[in-house]
Amino acid sequence: MVISDQRFRPKDKTEYLAWLEQNEQAMLAQFIESKGKLTTELKGLKDRLQEMNRQSQDLLQPYYQAQRRYFEHLYYNDRDTWIVLDPVISVHPDEIFFECFSEDESSYGKLSCSHNVFTNVGEKACGTTNIDYSDGLYQEFQKIRSYKRTTLAIDPGGFAVKTGDDAGFDEKKIDLPESWVRGFLQVSSAMTLPMASVQLHPMDVHNICFLLRRRKERVGPRSLRYLLTPGEPVRVTLDPWNIEIVCARSIYSGPEPRQIRVWGRRRLHILERLIPVARGFTLHLLGDGMPSFYVAELGDMSFTLGLSGWTANDWSRLGNFDLLAPRGNVDEFTLRRVYTALAENWCESAPSLARRLHTDEAVVKSALAVYSQKGQVLYDLAGGVYRIRELSREPLPLEQLRFSSEREAKADNFINAKLVKVESQERTAEGVRIAGSVLDNAVKYQASIVVDDDQRLRDAGCECFFWKQNRLRKGPCEHMLALRRAS
């Protein structure tokens, strides 16, 4: 202890500085001499690289030619395979937004960019177009940097992007595949359904993704369980390891406790690149095995990730959430009046439209739901407003799109044949509970539904096999739909 001295003493660099002063000129001359040698070596390496690139191009040319012939064959003989849910670009008075689906059609993404993001906004006209998201366009997006000037050009014929002094890339508009349209219709309808919402801190999303990266499940279940208790931190349990993450920064403020289980959790890795720049995430949950939406707040931008109930349950074929949307009887005059009022501002909330038109809010929501199912209106989950978004200049083939599932067609048949009997209607805290029976192939099925004040289906039950197997994860059965129509 007597000789112990832990005080900080800076290094004495006097000798080093003196040596550096004596040898500085010699070192500088040596550096200049080596620079010329390195420049010569670099030129030789560049020449070799160019020669190797030429040889590689010659070797791969037969492959590229065969690939081109294959894509041309798909284009002319199997157009649906050639086109896979490509992005939609919409220009609005307040923002530009891009929408797309994943290749397996189970994930939906929407990037909204306020006009404040851009230094200069030229002459613009509001509208929607769609393009083919090719590899060339993807590579051009990867060049975007904060220190480079990026130019976006959008017109009805396509989309162009140019970064810095690089040559720009122009992607042309393509035709709309049927599954592409149906996927957007289902997403628009799902966004209008009742949800449990919670604010998540970016580090909480990071912790979920981090644990999923560290572990790989070899047996089921492969689910995330969100445990929501009012006034307490959100808890997330990862199955099958039963690991619980306490999101201390994220407090649930909902009215009642909820436990919601979702699958297809590895799709959350899509959000990883946004975690460092996100100010927060808003999570919207519909229910067990139902879709979930993650909204990343990025300042003047926002990104919405919509996940179907599980990976195999894609948006365009197995999700029938348009059948759960508000279905109030709205006359044609009111429909056109609501749509015209929305088109005046291009985006507006349902309460604001109702006040402006002196109309009941439930009627406005039902009218907007009709246009959502027609592909003319989109619900913006991040802003809480409805937006004009025409998927096609021509009227969509709604009969083909609407009856991709036979359940609603069967429900229409039950109504037309007068096989539906409404036995009771009573008001509850959740809404109106309707009970009745449907005669299907000489078998009487008892069914019941609960419809809230916005005409949305909140709960339902039936005696049929479809409901016992799927509950509401694939939408209501034909007996519930018929009962709702008859009431």
Placement of each model-derived feature along the sequence:
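Long, low-complexity, compositionally biased intrinsically disordered regions
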Residues: 1-487
